[in-house]
């Protein structure tokens, strides 16, 4: 089984661009204290914005639909929410450092079934140095890894703080490449 084919010119790509805008503007620092709170907050927002997407918003909090799972390594893995049956998978992770590695691995699994994968990595107050180091360029290997996932694998990552950041610091470090925008791939993550 290979990865689901994905073109960056389709209704799924249009949904991906809208989702990018939504994630960048979502107030993660006010949403909750655990992964389930963040998932519920974002899912509720996406459900209320469903008319902006061409694909159905499917979440685990909406009992009228079911998120499709991916079977890999003898286990079913299910993203937190999707746009469409095979279009876009969204996975939120409330991060400790080990959780970061697990989330990247899950992104690969979901890419088997879905055209695009959005990983939203929510950094806890206790792990704020991960966010600060990524913001200041000290986490170059992590930045390069997330950039590579975006440019070659269609796995788009967003690193967001679950805490209020200092003035002048970004509220979201996103790795999403849109060829419609001007700018080079080297600017990924710098928006």
Where are these regions (language model features)?
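Interdomain/boundary linker segments immediately adjacent to catalytic/signaling cores
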Residues: 1-51
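Non-catalytic C-terminal interaction segments of nucleic acid-processing enzymes
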Residues: 1-13, 73, 144-191
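Active-site metal-binding core of divalent-cation-utilizing nuclease and nuclease-like domains
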Residues: 28-43, 52-86, 97-101, 165-173, ...
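Hydrophobic, Leu/Ile/Phe/Ala-enriched alpha-helical segments that form helix-helix packing faces
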Residues: 42-54, 145-153
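Short, charge-rich binding segments
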Residues: 82, 109-111
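Structural motif
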Residues: 88-90
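Catalytic toxin/effector domains delivered as secreted proteins or via bacterial secretion systems
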Residues: 94, 106
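Nucleic-acid nuclease catalytic cores
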Residues: 96-101, 111-169
């Amino acid at each position: 089984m290979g990865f689901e084919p994905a073109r960056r010119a389709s209704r799924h790509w249009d949904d991906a661009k809208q989702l990018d805008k939504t994630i960048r503007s979502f107030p993660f620092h006010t949403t909750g204290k655990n992964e389930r709170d963040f998932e519920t907050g974002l899912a509720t927002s996406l459900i209320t914005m469903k008319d902006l997407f061409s694909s159905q918003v499917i979440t685990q909090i909406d009992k009228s639909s079911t998120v499709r799972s991916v079977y890999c390594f003898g286990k079913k893995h299910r993203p937190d929410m999707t746009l469409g049956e095979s279009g876009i998978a969204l996975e939120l992770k409330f991060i400790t450092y080990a959780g970061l590695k697990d989330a990247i691995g899950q992104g690969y699994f979901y890419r088997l079934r879905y055209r695009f994968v959005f990983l939203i990595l929510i950094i806890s107050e206790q792990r704020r140095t991960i966010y600060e180091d990524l913001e200041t360029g000290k986490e170059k290997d992590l930045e390069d890894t997330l950039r590579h996932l975006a440019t070659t694998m269609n796995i788009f990552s967003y690193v967001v703080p679950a805490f209020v950041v200092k003035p002048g610091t970004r509220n979201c470090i996103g790795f999403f490449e849109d060829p419609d925008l001007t700018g080079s791939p080297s600017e990924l993550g710098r928006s």
